[in-house]
């Protein structure tokens, strides 16, 4: 137990401060926007302070633990704690949410509700990454759904209600399996529920039951991550959502599924994970090729970027299913890396749409001359997406490759085959990425359009993009900055597989 309730403050602060937005003076949106940005900044600085001064990197155990008895009736606790696995996603959440809030400047309709929902999402995400209780994990998982649904259905495009309904049906359907898994694991073997992660990690199950639990959790994470074939909500959602919502979806929401896969399926159900991992490896490999090929055929700019996100999630799945130090560390690095790259690409797609009012790539062309700053930044992030050496994506994918090659679990032939197919996926990535840049920025098509409203990126947008670009290059040059956070925890998780 920590001396001071740092994590509770970090989790509760955004939603508590968000509920005070209603008390702000009715003088336009500026006050609300700056208030929200200040809350996000303060939260990010507080989180960074706590991690710098109250967290030991070389300790793989849970730190800053807090445990309050919440509901006596069935022994439900408010149980929080962080380790090397959760520290990266929490800092990523703070960083991306702060930038997404400042990106939401064009939102003027119902801006109070919009900013409150963003802060509510912030609390839910940090709560999920720091929860140490299975039921609390589920509650935080569900807390995300309502803000995202409202952000989609109220501030989306023309088909926003369709995409919002599709999102809620998919994710709520997945959550049913998550709840069944939570209750099954919590109630197994006794009348008293056992929901503490530490207790559950030492619990053994019959193999058949463990597989059922694993499969239930896997479906919930497959929807959120997404893993094919449960990915079809994602392109529609990204295609219609406002770009600040897209930044949160691509940067953080998709990473919750991958985090859950490591935190619950790998850590609490190691035998089932060992059985499922070859199948996950096959699905991840197919996903890289399928999503990259499908992305190439998309006319809608945001849908093309959405499919590229699905393709990149394939690398994370492969890293997790390799069951090696390098593979799992690479997957965690890819979670952080793609959080930055995905958020930046959706922000650029949204700001471009604000100016040219065109969604489809075949209607665009020649923007490079009219908007050189947007062209430069888009090219930079496209290069980051296709894993250019010196940027974070390259290191993450390289470490995942190393993880597969060194994995003792798989035969040499299967490792060569998987590596070969992944390499084809890495060749397809620059094809759809560079063809997207070519269709948008080169040619002469838009010179015929009256271009009085073609204004290049302003200082605010350039600032947001540079804030995202710097960590991408920083991680690419010195990946140990992120890897050092998780390396001890990864060893602790994998000890279940080699000594358990």
Swiss-Prot record:
Membrane protein topology class: Multi-pass membrane protein
Major localisation: plastid
Subcellular location: Plastid, Chloroplast thylakoid membrane
EC number: 7.1.1.-
Alphabetical GO biological process terms: ATP synthesis coupled electron transport; electron transport coupled proton transport
InterPro entries: NADH_Q_OxRdtase_chain4, NADH_Q_OxRdtase_chainM/4, NADH_UbQ_OxRdtase, ND/Mrp_TM
Molecular function GO terms recorded: NADH dehydrogenase (ubiquinone) activity; ubiquinone binding
One GO term describing the cellular component: chloroplast thylakoid membrane
UniProt superkingdom: Eukaryota
UniProt signal peptide: none
Catalytic reaction list: a plastoquinone + NADH + (n+1) H(+)(in) = a plastoquinol + NAD(+) + n H(+)(out); a plastoquinone + NADPH + (n+1) H(+)(in) = a plastoquinol + NADP(+) + n H(+)(out)
PANTHER family reported in the protein's UniProt record: NAD(P)H-QUINONE OXIDOREDUCTASE CHAIN 4, CHLOROPLASTIC, NADH-UBIQUINONE OXIDOREDUCTASE CHAIN 4
HAMAP family for this protein: NDH1_NuoM
Family: Belongs to the complex I subunit 4 family.
Protein name: NAD(P)H-quinone oxidoreductase chain 4, chloroplastic
């Amino acid at each position: 137990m920590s001396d001071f309730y740092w994590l509770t403050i970090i989790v509760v602060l955004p939603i508590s401060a968000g509920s005070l937005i209603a008390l702000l003076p009715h003088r336009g949106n500026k006050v609300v926007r700056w208030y929200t940005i200040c809350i996000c900044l303060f939260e990010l600085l507080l989180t960074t302070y706590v991690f710098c001064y109250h967290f030991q990197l070389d300790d793989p155990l849970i730190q800053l633990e807090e445990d309050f008895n919440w509901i006596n009736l069935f022994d439900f606790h408010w149980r929080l704690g962080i380790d090397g696995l959760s520290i990266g996603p929490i800092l990523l959440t703070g960083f991306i949410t702060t930038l997404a809030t400042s990106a939401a400047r064009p939102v003027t309709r119902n801006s109070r509700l919009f900013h409150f929902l963003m802060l509510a999402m912030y609390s839910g995400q940090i709560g999920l990454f720091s929860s140490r209780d299975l039921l609390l994990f589920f509650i935080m998982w569900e807390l995300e759904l309502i803000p995202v649904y409202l952000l989609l259905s109220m501030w989306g495009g023309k088909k926003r209600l369709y995409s919002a309904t599709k999102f809620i049906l998919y994710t709520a359907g997945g959550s049913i399996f998550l709840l069944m898994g939570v209750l099954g694991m919590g109630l197994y073997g006794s009348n008293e529920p056992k929901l503490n992660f530490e207790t559950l990690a030492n619990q053994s199950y019959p193999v058949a039951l463990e597989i059922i639990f694993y499969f239930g959790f896997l479906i919930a994470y497959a929807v959120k991550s997404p893993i094919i074939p449960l990915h079809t909500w994602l392109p529609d959602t990204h295609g219609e959502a406002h770009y600040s919502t897209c930044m949160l979806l691509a940067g953080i929401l998709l990473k919750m599924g991958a985090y859950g896969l490591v935190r619950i399926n790998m850590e609490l159900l190691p035998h089932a994970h060992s059985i499922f991992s070859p199948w996950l490896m096959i699905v991840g490999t197919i996903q890289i090729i399928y999503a990259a090929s499908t992305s190439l055929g998309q006319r809608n700019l945001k849908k093309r970027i959405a499919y590229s996100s699905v393709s990149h999630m394939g690398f994370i799945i492969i890293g997790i299913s390799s069951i090696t130090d390098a593979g799992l560390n690479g997957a965690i690095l890819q979670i952080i890396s793609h959080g930055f790259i995905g958020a930046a690409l959706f922000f650029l797609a949204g700001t471009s749409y604000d100016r040219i009012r065109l969604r489809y790539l075949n209607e665009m062309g020649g923007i490079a001359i009219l908007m050189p700053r947007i062209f430069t930044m888009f090219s930079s992030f496209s290069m980051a997406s296709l894993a250019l050496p010196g940027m974070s994506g390259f290191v993450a994918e390289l470490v995942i490759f190393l993880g597969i090659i060194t994995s003792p679990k798989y035969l040499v032939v299967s490792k060569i085959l998987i590596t070969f197919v992944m390499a084809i996926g890495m060749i397809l990535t620059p094809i759809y990425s560079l063809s997207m840049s070519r269709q948008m920025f080169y040619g002469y098509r838009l010179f015929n359009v009256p271009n009085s409203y073609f204004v290049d990126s302003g200082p605010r947008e350039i600032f947001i993009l540079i804030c995202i670009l710097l960590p991408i290059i920083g991680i690419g040059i010195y990946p140990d900055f992120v890897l050092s956070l998780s390396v001890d925890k990864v060893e602790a998780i994998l000890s279940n597989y080699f000594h358990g």
